[in-house]
Amino acid sequence: MALISQRFATREKLILVGLYLSKYDRLGLQRLGFGSFTEAFNVIGYAMGSRPASIKNYRDEFDPLFPNRRKGWHKRPLRRYCLKVFEEYKSLDLESFAGLVKSFFGYDENAWSEVQEKEDEEESESQFAKRLITGLTAEQYFQSIHHNLSEFEGYSLENTTRLGCGYDFRLRKNPGGDFLAVEVKGLKERTGNLSLTPKEHQLATALRDRFFLFVVKNFQESPFHEIFSNPLSGRLQFKKRETLTVHISWLTRV
């Protein structure tokens, strides 16, 4: 079955994630690299621009249909639009269903599996969750609450994550005026390590008080955030780390 994620509306994606988590339970969590349902609800919910509780509710809705330990919403019939999704996708095997869920976030399961060694499979599973936490999920979290933050009150928001400019968001009060740059990082736990790329470090040095490091922590339980203005001159202590990378290519003459 060819599954193209672009044809799904957001609500249908949420329903499908709920169905996946209900059907495959903890095996499904492991296949996506999550350690708990709470972590999966938080990470996927925010990444989709929705509430974590929405995914939990859809999982609970499907629970009476599967032999897991949860009772779910067993006292009411399945809603019509959920039943429609269930009937269409209930037969998906674990690999296909996990690949579909990953495709919602731009992860091409089939392309990667062609070159992936078996011993890398476990690492690949954990990398999916890690990349969501450190990337899209943290960015969507920031977008969902930035208008409530006093530091950015009255500023318009521009998403620059695809521009490669050394920060994730640009905020301005007036068109053409000075802007604030916000680099967003995400952590699974309450504490952890994070790094700045050379470009991010360069921009933080140049912009000083106009550069903000926004760190979302504890996605495994209950996310919260910390904001660091001019992070290179505050209480954070950065240590330079140099890594030698070997690039290999194959050349020919025609």
List where the protein language model places each region.
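Interdomain/boundary linker segments immediately adjacent to catalytic/signaling cores
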Residues: 75-132
